[in-house]
Amino acid sequence: ENYTFDFLMENLWWPGLTMTRPEMTKRLLSQVHYQKKGIMLDTGHLMHMNLELKTQDEAVDYILEKVAEHGNLASYIKGMHLNQSITGAYVKTLITKKDAMPSDYEACSKACYEHVFQIDQHLPFTTPKVQKLVETIKPEYLTHELMSYGRSEHEIKLVMQRAALKGKNL
């Protein structure tokens, strides 16, 4: 078949394509036999791999460090899901809790989703340093992947992140 679409694999924050081990990224990419394969870098997911991050500037530095560690493999990053989520303190607290999960499937599922949304918040970047991140990676596809509860909140968050991309400090 002569497919023309890009096949992009998104990094996650659980074992698999975490973008923290270049040898694993290389291994995964080598098993995909398609010319237009690549990576969709979710910045928030990569941030979850470092529980010590305290600021957006630290997060941008961390992401750039991980991209640099990938060397030539970084050229496979064709897209970005741009968002930030600095939740290491929450995760550290969660890890130490001994609370049992509900045994009822529906209640357990609800509890899991609540934790996931506390960890993976999809907030806008507000630091102008994010401009360097996007300029370094030069993605073909850039998605402002932001979570909101309505159109007006989404617009506010989008305006904030776009301002940061233009170098404005919020």
Question: Where in this protein do the model-derived segments appear?
Answer:
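Alpha-helical structural signal in soluble globular domains
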Residues: N2, R27-V32, E69, K132-T136, ...
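Gly/Pro-rich active-site loop or hairpin
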Residues: T18-P22, M47-P139
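Active-site-proximal loop/turn and secondary-structure-junction residues that shape catalytic pockets
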Residues: N11-P15, T43-M47, Q84-I86, S148-G150
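Hydrophobic faces of well-ordered beta-strands that scaffold small-molecule active sites
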Residues: F7-M9, K37-D42, K78-L82, E140-E145
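Short, surface-exposed amphipathic charged segments that create phosphate/polyanion-binding patches used
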Residues: E23-M24, T96-K97, K157-R162
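Short active-site-adjacent structural elements
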Residues: G88-V91, G150-H154
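C-terminal helical cap(s) of enzyme catalytic domains, especially alpha/beta-barrels
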Residues: R151-L170
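Active-site acidic/histidine proton-transfer and metal-coordination neighborhood
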Residues: E1-G38, H48
